[in-house]
């Protein structure tokens, strides 16, 4: 399963398996702040975004909206993951939301963790519940 963005699809294709896209795993929309360094985002906007998960930057998406769509996508994968391995290729913000889902915590945890590009987070299921097995694993890219 892949984000529809080209860079994610190219990574997914490297597994040599058919790639299914799911719009819900697309990166968070930063709106007018897309590509802008954190240091260049006005402090009021940055503080609102960090404190209020429902805050929507101009032209963007709230963390609450991201969290809702990723949790729904993860819930939809539970049945398939009970009978086979499922690989999701996505982006930092959706993967942090998936980790929050697996841990049963709110999206606010995303501000307290770091994911490297091309890192792996492994979520397995035990007794029908998600269990985070690895986080930010990078051994495959060294």
Residue positions per predicted region:
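Short glycine-rich phosphate-binding loop at a beta-alpha junction
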Residues: 1-4, 85-89
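A short beta-strand-loop-alpha-helix capping motif that often carries His-Thr
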Residues: 87-98
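Generic structural signal for well-ordered alpha-helical scaffold segments
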Residues: 67, 71-79, 99
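Acidic, low-complexity terminal tails and accessory targeting/binding regions
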Residues: 17, 28-40, 79-84, 101-142
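Amphipathic, non-transmembrane alpha-helical scaffold segments
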Residues: 1, 5, 63, 67-71, ...
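Short glycine/proline- and acidic residue-enriched helix-loop micro-motifs
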Residues: 45-65
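Phosphate-coordination/substrate-recognition cap region in phosphate-metabolizing enzymes
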Residues: 1-46
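Alpha-helix N-cap/helix-start capping motif
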Residues: 5-9, 92-93, 117
């Amino acid at each position: 399963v892949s984000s529809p963005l080209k860079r994610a699809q190219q990574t997914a294709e490297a597994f040599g398996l058919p790639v299914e896209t799911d719009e819900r795993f697309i990166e968070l929309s930063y709106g007018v702040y897309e590509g802008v360094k954190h240091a260049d985002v006005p402090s009021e906007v940055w503080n609102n975004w960090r404190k209020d998960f429902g805050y929507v930057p101009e032209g963007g998406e709230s963390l609450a909206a991201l969290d809702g769509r990723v949790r729904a996508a993860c819930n939809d994968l539970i049945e398939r993951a009970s009978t086979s391995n499922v690989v999701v290729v996505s982006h930092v913000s959706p993967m942090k939301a998936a980790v929050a889902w697996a841990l049963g915590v709110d999206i606010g945890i995303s501000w307290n963790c770091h994911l490297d590009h091309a890192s792996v987070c492994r979520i397995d299921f035990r007794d029908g519940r998600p269990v985070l097995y690895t986080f930010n694993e990078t051994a495959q890219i060294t």
